[in-house]
Regions:
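Short S/T/G/P-rich N-terminal loop/turn motif that feeds into the first structured element of a domain
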Residues: 1-53, 58-70, 93-95
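C-terminal structural segments of small proteins and small subunits
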Residues: 62-90
């Protein structure tokens, strides 16, 4: 079964609120078995506009990644991110 990935590209506007968001996601990350493959670090925009922070989370399946995003645990944590960062979240299925 192909793995699922959530790809996040954000520009953080409020580091304190974003830190609360990141800490609040811990329960959902553990519950859904998410594995962070990328969390920040060196990056280069090859095409398009770069974002300051890039994250890639791996899940056992597309469905598990989707369940993580829509879970009550993640949705509660997400409230800390609203207004703290601008960006995109994309759910993709691996090859």
């Amino acid at each position: 079964m192909p793995k699922g990935y959530i790809i996040v590209r954000v520009d953080v506007k409020d580091p304190e609120a974003y830190a609360r968001y990141a800490a609040a996601t811990a329960d959902a990350v553990k519950k859904f078995g998410a594995r962070p493959l990328v969390r920040g670090g060196k990056h280069e925009a090859l095409e398009g506009t770069a974002r300051a922070r890039n994250v890639v989370m791996e899940f056992d399946s597309f469905e598990q990644a989707r369940a993580y995003y829509y879970s009550p645990e993640y949705q509660a944590a997400r409230q800390h991110r609203i207004g703290a960062a601008d960006g995109e979240f994309v759910l993709v299925e691996g090859a």
